[in-house]
Amino acid sequence: MKLLHVDGSILGPHSVSRTVSAAIVDRLRAQHPGLDVIYRDLAGTPLPHLSGAVLAGAQPNATNTPDVQHDVELGRQVLEEFLAAEIVVIGAPLYNFTLSSQLKAWIDRILVAGVTFRYGPSGAEGLAGGKRVIAVVSRGGLYGPGTPAAAAEHAETYLRTVLAFIGITAPEVIVAEGIALGPEARERALAGALDAAAALKAA
């Protein structure tokens, strides 16, 4: 069984989403001793943002400069990692009301027409269903349903939309919020998220 672990936080060891996503992977490793884990630290090794040159360079028979060809091949590798994974664990902090740009760059490499989705007479159809996706969303403030800032939350809502678009309609989402509201609030949020991670089903 293959697991892809993706972290989008820029905060390293101070990151709540990284702490919780790592705990999830550790739990799944313990439950599945033969688990094959691929890890992408999108802050430590950022992916280049998608460009017109790369889109053109990915077309059949394209003639590319070495830099563009490297970027095209990197995009293919990222896509293949995602397609091969049966489980995907995503650490997704909320930065300025949305995902980190590093995580968005990864998403742009896995949303590929004809591979993870396609357009037909009835609109878009997801082609990447069947995966188990577990996302950890960390938020400094309070953005949950019913809060004054709920409409400004574009990390969890965006992730759910993107995943549904490619056929993953039931992701498991763990939220840690209020982590910037003081040390006690941070500890409560982290503890609650770790408890939720420990309660995840084995498979």
Swiss-Prot record:
Pfam families: Flavodoxin_2 (PF02525). The keyword Oxidoreductase applies. Its cofactor is FMN. Its EC number is 1.6.5.-, 1.7.1.17. Binds 1 FMN per subunit. The keyword Protease does not apply. It catalyses: 2 a quinone + NADH + H(+) = 2 a 1,4-benzosemiquinone + NAD(+); N,N-dimethyl-1,4-phenylenediamine + anthranilate + 2 NAD(+) = 2-(4-dimethylaminophenyl)diazenylbenzoate + 2 NADH + 2 H(+). Homodimer. This is FMN-dependent NADH:quinone oxidoreductase. The lineage of its organism: Bacteria, Pseudomonadati, Pseudomonadota, Alphaproteobacteria, Hyphomicrobiales.
